[in-house]
Every structure is written in C-alpha cells, then in structure tokens.
Amino acid sequence: MSNIAKVLSRRQDRGEGVGTNEKAIPFNKQDYQTLKQECLVKKTLFCDPTFPAESDSLGYNELGRYSFKTRGVQWKRPKELCSNPEFIVDGAKRTDICQGALGDCWLLAAIASLTLDNAILERVVPPGQSFIEDYAGIFHFQLWQFGEWVDVVIDDRLPTRDGKLLFVHSAEGSEFWSALLEKAYAKLNGSYEALTGGSTTEGFEDFTGGIAENYELSKAPPYLFKLMQKALTLGSLLGCSIDITSSYESEAVTSLKLVKGHAYSVTSAEEVHSYGHLVQLVRIRNPWGQVEWTGPWSDNSKEWNSIQPEEKAKLVYSGEDGEFWMAYSDFIQQFSKLEICNLTPDTLSSEDASHWNYNQFEGNWRVGSTAGGCRNNPATFCSNPQYVIKLEEEDDDPLDGEDGCTILVGLMQKDGRKDKRFGRDLNTIGFAIYKFMGRNNINLGPDVLLRQRSIAGSNTFINLREVSERFKLPPGEYVIIPSTFESHRKGSFVLRVFTEKEAAASPMDTEISADVKKQYISESDVDPHFKHLFNQTAGNDSEVSVFELQQILDSVTSKQTDVKTDGFSMETCRHIISLLDKDGSSKLGLVEFHILWKKIQKYLEVFKKHDTDNSGTMSSHEMRDAVKEAGFQLNNEVLEVIISRYANQQYAIDFDCFVGCLIRLEMLFKIFKTFDKKNTGKIELDILQVTHKCECGLRFLYLLNLAFSFTNVFFVCVLQWLCLALS
C-alpha cells in the first residue's frame, strides 16, 4: 500500500475509534477470536508463526542462537510444566510477579503496579482466559504502542530450562498470566532480549497509554509527597530506583538491603501518627518478591509499636513478600529517581478521571522536509512540526501554591526496542515551547523563532524513548516544537499533552492554496521575434509536440551554466502539454508556447533566487520558500510527498524537477477547482470521473480505494487529493 494511502486510511480508522482500548488493532493482523475458533474446530493447539518457539524469539546477541545463555532452553506449554495450570489464581496480585534470568525488572515493576487496579489490569489482561474452558493454547493481551492500542496474540509455549520457566514466573508455581504477558510484550518488541534494560515508566505507559514524568529525589520539590498521594488517588502508577555509578554496581545490595540499578514499584503513600508526630510513609515493592529494606519502618521494626492499632491495621507491613514501608524522609535519601505515570481519562473509571485533559498528535521528522533539528540549526529549525495549545483556566488547587496552568508534555520516539537488533540508536530528542502571538494557526517562521527565546522546554535533549516535563505557565497560547538535536535525522514520534483544565490543541500548519495568475493573451500580443523563433522550431504544423518540447527545453536549459539539470523527462513534458493545451491537439500552439515560455522564465528566476549557496540545485528546505513564491501555499504533509517524489539522494532538486513539480501542482489545483464548483474545499468523484478525467486515473483510483472504503463515490479534500496524486 502507498504510504500516503496508509496514512489516510489510518486517519479514517482513528475517526471511527480504531486503536482505542475498546477497538484495539490486531497486531500482525492476527485476530484472536478467529484463530482460537479455528484451533477449536480442528482440535489443535495454536502455534504462532509470527513469534515461533525458536532461538530468534529469545534474542539476537546475549540470547542469540549460539549464546551459552540459551543452551538447554526448551519451549513448553504450562500443561507440560504442571498438572493443573491456572491463568490467574485468586486474582492478580503484585506478589505474582517474580523476576527470572532476564534484565527486565523495569517491566516487572510496572506489571506489579498494574495489579493495584483491577479495572486497569483488565484493559491489558482481558478476562475470560483459562487453561480449562475452550483451551486452545492461545492467549491475548492488549498493549499501548505509540498512540494506539494493539491486541497481541500469542501461543502458550514458554522458554524453560530444567522444567522451570526461564524468565518471569509467579511465586504460585501453577499461575501463568505474568509469564504470558511478558511473552506478549516480547513479541511486540521483537524478542525477549529486546526487553533488557529500561525504565519503569516505559512499562507504565505501554500498559496504560499514560504519560510519565521523572523526579530526581536529590532535588525533590517540597510538595512531592502530596503529589505522590494525589497521583496514587488518581490511579497513577509509580516506580523508583537507585542510580549506579558503574556496571559493577548493577543489582548490588546495600547494607540496608536495597538493590541498586533495580526497578521498584511504589504502591502507597500514607501518613500515620507516631509518638504524637505525623510521619509520612511510602510503601515499595521489589519485583524479586524478596530482599527488603531493613531500616526504620521495615517489617517488624520497632517503629510499628509507636502507632495506634487502628492505624496499624490499615497498613500491611509484615511477611517476606518483597514489599515494605519506609519513611518518606528515608525514601528521598536512599532512592535516586521517582517515576510517575499519569493516566488518560479513558483509563480511569472514577469521576476523578476528568482531572486530566488529554491531547495526542503523531508526526514525523522527514529528512529534507521536517527534520529541522534544534534551534542550533537556524536554517532548518522552523521546518520542524509545530503544535499550538491554548491555556485559558488556571488550576483550582495548585500543589505548589503558585497560580497558573499545569501542563505535562511528553515527546516519544517510536520503535527503539525493535531497532536494537539492527544496531540502530535512538535519536537525541527534545522540545521547545514558544509564546504564540496569534497568526491564524500558520507555522511560525524564522522571523519569529530566531528572534524570540523559548519560554519553556525539555531540560535537555536526550537519547531516550521519551522526554517529558511538567510546567506551570500563565494562561495564553503556546507553540510546542518537537525536534531531534541534530538536523536531517529521520524519525517518527508521538507528542502528548496533559493539562489540568480543558485546553484546545491542534497542529500548526499552512493552509493549502494556490495563487497562480492566469495569462490572457492573443496571437497579436506575441512579439514578432518570438513568432519567428517559434515557427522555426515548430515546423510545418506550427505546433510543438511532446518530443519537440523535450528537445527545446533541454537545449535551452543546457546553456544555463548556473543551474543543474539532467534533462526534462517525457513525463514532465506531457504534464506541460496537458496543462496548457487548450484545443485538445496534444500539442502547443504559438500562444500556448508563449505562456509556457513566460512560466519557464519566472521559474528560473525563482530557482536562482532560492539557490542560496549557488550550487545549481535547490535544497529541500530552500524548496519550501521557492514553492511559496511561485504561488503555492503547501503544508508539511504535501511538502514531504514532494521531496520524496522530486529530490535526489542528497535531498537536492535540480531545475527540471523544480519545473516538473510546479507544473504538476498547477495542473492538480486546476483539476480540483474544476470539480469543486461550490468552492467547498471538497470534491465528489465517481469511479468514471476518477478513471477518465484524472491523470493516471487507474492508479489514482487504486490509491483512493486503499485509503477509503470502496464505494461508487469518493469524497476527497484538497490535502488528500494532492498527497495521493503526487505520491
């Protein structure tokens, strides 16, 4: 399918709710119910061909085919490991998750937090799955991936060694939901090894679709404990960890039994009265299911004797289960980092869910068009995607006591874990926020962005999956500009914005339009010298054919030493004749050729003006302003298509491609306006009109059919028209 058709099809699906948790997209196009029914009818157990029980599913390096770590690994179904396997025993609990021989404690800490809210858990682990009723060796889980929910189908063959699960397992030996969830997550990311190393927030986000924020506990704001309580009340997921200074410290145990470089989940934050003083306590869980804090307020410590029995009864504080309490004052001293995942309104079932207003946008950094880099790249910075948000109401009850509008911004780049196997590194990403002075939602240009300082932004540019920050801004309109640190770095991203109050947000872009002056001339207006030259060139029929036109244009441009061209293509020459041929002869007469000549002169003038480095070609970023001067207002989406269609491997456009692009644009706008008689910005085409009146009609019909559901009539806006026809 054409990339543009894919985008338009996906956009239509989104409008119908596809990609939400209720309408999750089947991952790898595998439909759970269909596959399960097929297995039940055939009386076979499901074997997943897209994530086979083979070494490639384990990993590619340390868990690769020839690694000693994978020797003796056998894939077995739960019924081969115990006589009476169960999916979930007495409800999913955080004590069900114990780490195996995989460095994915970050993921297990997130799974543990997931069990604190059954409604959230069931969004990820659909109920009704078992090893008894309608068992077919197939299970499914729903996971959030870069802005949309996907339904991941797996078989229940799990990696084992010596009859025991190799990776995550339950303390209850016959329970398998956590091991199967880990397998689904491994499939989503390409392998088990792809899960090695990460932050708890990544798991939080992929289980909820929420947005995460990080706090350095050495710089904890004074209101952080209250913020933790509020976050837990709102169903947010919290994790914490202790930084390491070298790889030797990874998972080293301190004298007080805390594990360095290890992901913990925070499960509660409470206040109790101890000897007449109010003490703030935090409950933390180690996903190992053992190794607990031994300092003040640990299990059976003397501090528990100082509180009233009724307060003590509310807090579970004993048992070697990996969970323990500690004073908040010790928490911020012993731990280095706190991660909070704030949930989207649709995730929460309580009335408090409306606390957050949520906006989400998907975008791309395309080399040559929208990969402008950070502000250190003044020539290209303004070509980055831009988004405007309007903050109108201040917070009701600010935790920090300051008036203003709370805004959480998260910028996430896609597919980092999948790309690990190919040795690809994450981009270094960040964002800047500018005060918007109100210009009708049109992209801010260098006249604004290079003269104005950003008022906020990410603290740093960093090569992580996501960078997020919380801000307090006065009411007003702002522009958020996500970018890579370096220019010309390809990538896809999701930008998410949470606000405490309702806030309107939308992409900034240029309204698509064309202002090409029509030329009305008669034969008497043509200069006699030009007539003489035309008659010499045109021959006996006094008309220029497509072949003659190609020779003329190549001959003229070859004499221009300051522009580069590799010759006008036959396709471009046909487009020129299609645009200017008034009498249907498929040739150009004197007047038609004269109009073309004026266009070529204008295009040459524009081309030279915007070839700022005098290279004889135009860079893709120079193309943006050149097209505008030629009379076409285009947005980023159309410009991306143009660059991919007309630029060479170095993202440069020579003169013949420049002319071909402008001629094609003028022709497409002309066709669109012919159909759009009421000037609505939308046209209605039946199949006959598409195939007979549109250039490359059958191919265009094919793209339309991919992008939209097949009917006898297509409704197409100018953006869809240009993107599909140019691609």
What are these regions (language model features)?
Residues 707, 713-716:
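Acidic, Ala/Val/Gly-enriched low-complexity intrinsically disordered segments
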Residues 612:
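Short, conserved catalytic or interaction motifs in soluble domains
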Residues 702, 710-711:
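Low-complexity, disordered terminal segments
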Residues 615, 622:
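A contiguous pocket-lining binding segment that forms or flanks enzyme active sites
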Residues 1, 706-709:
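Bacterial/eukaryotic Sec-type N-terminal signal peptides
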Residues 1-575, 582-594, 598-605, 609, ...:
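Structured alpha-helical subdomains that flank or immediately precede key functional sites
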